[in-house]
Amino acid sequence: MNQPLQHAASLLPEDPAALRQLIRAGRYRGHTSGLARGHVQANIVILTRDWAYDFLQFCALNRKACPLIDVTDPGDPVFRNLGRDVDIRTDVPMYRVYRDGNAYHETTGITELWRDDFVAFAIGCSFSFEQALLAANVPLKHINLGRNVAMYRTAIETRPAGRLSGKLVVSMRPLKAADAILATEITARYPDVHGAPVHIGDPRLIGIEDIESPDYGDAVPLDADEIPVFWACGVTPQAVIREARPEICITHAPGCMLVTDLDNNRL
């Protein structure tokens, strides 16, 4: 029996469709940071039809955290605008399933859970702008260490929509001062994948008390000559929806994105 592959860009296909096939076959279950470089990655939220409008409105009001790039018709598991044969039931390395907002369980496929009233949302991910940062020689420590990006809940309020409200989640990348300035200039060009940072510097100012203990992802060390740079994160919907307690909600596991065929340069 084939064993799942470990995260290593050199061992995994660069073609996003080939990578999705590997994921669909259960051969890769890890995070997707640094994989299929140059292609858009997406956070995933799946809700029942009766919650879909509230979430659509939430995305419109909180575009920094939830830049919507595609949505499916009710009951249709295929994203028609993200590439060829993109099946949301099988093409994410790891899913989280929440019921009534309670503790999640993780699974590598949701075909057996799929319902005719499910609507799937694809939300832009900061992994997509990492290629532009690397091309500009901005070092990304989490990729160099083979880790998931660090993500934190903050004290920053999102704008409420219907039954949905809550705090912003951010991703953090340690950068030297000059690189932080360059990264801000570069990521501002990518509003469909979170755009420019929401905060630079002291994490306590946005409600993060212990930067060494992320709420999601992996801890990434901060050297003395580095400052933390924070971007709005597509894990925000998971925190918000969990508080709203819908009957069922399915998301990607943090860091385990849907890799699309879309070119980052078209964003």
Curated annotation (Swiss-Prot):
Coiled coil (UniProt feature): none
InterPro entries: D-Glu_cyclase, Putative_hydro-lyase, UPF0317
Keyword Ion transport: no
Lineage top rank: taxon: Bacteria
Keyword Lyase: yes
EC supergroup of this enzyme: lyase
EC number: 4.2.1.-
Keyword entries, A-Z: Lyase
Gene Ontology MF terms: lyase activity
PANTHER family found in the cross-reference section: D-GLUTAMATE CYCLASE, MITOCHONDRIAL
Family: Belongs to the D-glutamate cyclase family.
HAMAP family cross-referenced by the UniProt entry: Hydro_lyase (MF_01830)
Protein's name in the database: Putative hydro-lyase RALTA_B1245
Source species: Cupriavidus taiwanensis (strain DSM 17343 / BCRC 17206 / CCUG 44338 / CIP 107171 / LMG 19424 / R1)
